[in-house]
């Protein structure tokens, strides 16, 4: 918890002004800590900060709250961006939520998920950065053999905010409306173009056709073609 300054060699609190969370592996062992910044006006500081990597703590190979979510009976896991999102989901009864450890989803993380479920619902932040991260996560999850659905946040920036504003029942309805990953990606392509413009319409059709053509399942290609 104490770090040596690279500037002057002094000791300082690595997690000062941060709300701290224990990071627990799937065996129930505390392997590190994560800290969320409390002063949101400090734009220069990272939103989340983890313990330094050690022989027992590798953030690429662990997921926050998986020690709890692996026991869920819901039949799927929810993957979110932040610890607060995962905690809020558990508090509101969605006990299948996990979060990456302050970094983008890795193949190690996806493979870890595949040990406990066959389906993952991605619920990243609704901003551009969150949606870009969603697009990057989809092929990583599919490579691990997981079925992927996507819930795009609306009326709130993230699950934590949505649950506090609207409650569990509204979120449950939203969750049931999650799109499969092909529908999500086709809709994302559609939003890039103005179909009233012939040139943009051609570009939309070309990009959509490219996505559909890349599908490994002949049935999917038939359905979406």
Question: What annotation goes with each model-predicted range?
Answer:
Residues 21, 71, 111, 135, ...:
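A broad, structural surface signal
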